[in-house]
């Protein structure tokens, strides 16, 4: 994966308002904002197509990005993205500043691996994914692009919870930090495949005798 998807050029935007944003979009520019830390929020403009291409990669949403803001590097995380309801177009993007030495809080996707090696799945079980990402906190340098959920040893009827996951060093689950069972969320369950509806032979026989 090219590091280019994690580096974006941006410029400070002073022409604000809906009309200005519409003009930017007609020029294939993307309005956005950077906030967080002790600095004031900054409205910015980016190249829409470059951001749209980067947004096709899952890691774009769980990776510390570098915005070259008028030539000055600023480290950020994607916090929100507004898309057009039916066109392949991004309407607005929000970034949060990453502050050196401060923990970041963000969602990281889960990758379910080795399902094909699970005896339960081989026996016809179906893996029901309850969540596909979890909220974590860590130092920026420790932020993983994804967290693996190893399904190889999961048995039929078993539910994997947050507390069963192996998190990378320095990474903590926000939910588990609340220290009660209600926040030990179910991640995935392997369930038996639903049985086909059984024929009511007695009913059929009774109907044939009438």
Curated annotation (Swiss-Prot):
BP-aspect Gene Ontology terms: translation
Pfam families per the UniProt record, alphabetical: Ribosomal_L25p, Ribosomal_TL5_C
Taxonomic superkingdom: Bacteria
InterPro entries, per database record: Rbsml_bL25/Gln-tRNA_synth_N, Ribosomal_bL25/Gln-tRNA_synth, Ribosomal_bL25_b-dom, Ribosomal_bL25_C, Ribosomal_bL25_long, Ribosomal_bL25_short, Ribosomal_L25_dom, Ribosomal_uL5_bac-type
Compositionally skewed regions (Acidic residues) per UniProt: 199-210
Location of the region described as Disordered in the Swiss-Prot/TrEMBL record: 191-210
Keyword presence, DNA-binding: no
CC per GO annotation: cytosolic large ribosomal subunit
GO molecular function, one term: structural constituent of ribosome
Record carries keyword Cytoplasm: no
Keywords annotated in UniProt: Ribonucleoprotein, Ribosomal protein, RNA-binding, rRNA-binding
NCBIfam families attached to this UniProt entry: bL25_bact_ctc, PRK05618.1-2, PRK05618.1-5, PRK05943.1
Family: Belongs to the bacterial ribosomal protein bL25 family. CTC subfamily.
Quaternary assembly: Part of the 50S ribosomal subunit; part of the 5S rRNA/L5/L18/L25 subcomplex. Contacts the 5S rRNA. Binds to the 5S rRNA independently of L5 and L18.
Main function: This is one of the proteins that binds to the 5S RNA in the ribosome where it forms part of the central protuberance.
Protein name: Large ribosomal subunit protein bL25
Upper classification of the organism: Bacteria, Pseudomonadati, Pseudomonadota, Gammaproteobacteria, Alteromonadales
Originating gene: rplY
